[in-house]
């Protein structure tokens, strides 16, 4: 079964970038919360960069997944589509939960700094810092597991369809594809209808 970087590593890299963003925040906290003039606002830096990078990688994975979906959905069970979408949902839930934890952390640190209670500032930040790391790792593993399972199962069923072992129609998304006639006017006569042959693993 053919593999390439585009199809099978974007989800992993996206979740890795997200986790690293919150892990590096612990290093940032050690420098920004222990100086003579602690600054809580810098705690947004690495998580923000991690979220942006992760979102870009995941965007391309979703884009490529959806590119041929209207035509290839007839050849694999629709439950794998829901499995993939569940992975996407968990990914964004991961971001949401960690942004909330980060906001609580910055608010707590800002209040303590404004009260000029610099003693134990970093120690008080550790629980939320490590909670964010733990949550990001846990939810990232779930997201990767769901997305990779969907990719693999779809690959397998597309290859079976290519070999003449199609999936039962009642298990697939059999809704018809809406064709834009304006876009097909310029196509040559004799184009073949969508089928399972060709590049079967672009999902």
UniProtKB/Swiss-Prot annotation:
Residue stretches of biased makeup (Basic and acidic residues): 164-174, 182-191
Tell me the segments the record calls region Disordered.
Answer: 164-203
Provide ranges: composition bias, Polar residues: 194-203
Q: Name one Pfam family in it.
A: DUF5453
Q: How does it sit in the membrane?
A: Multi-pass membrane protein
Record keywords, A-Z: Cell membrane, Membrane, Transmembrane, Transmembrane helix
Segments passing through the bilayer: 9-29, 42-62, 86-106, 126-146
What is the protein name given in its UniProt record? Answer: Uncharacterized protein MG028 homolog
**Compartment annotation:** Cell membrane
The highest taxon in the source lineage is Bacteria
GO CC annotation: what is one?
plasma membrane
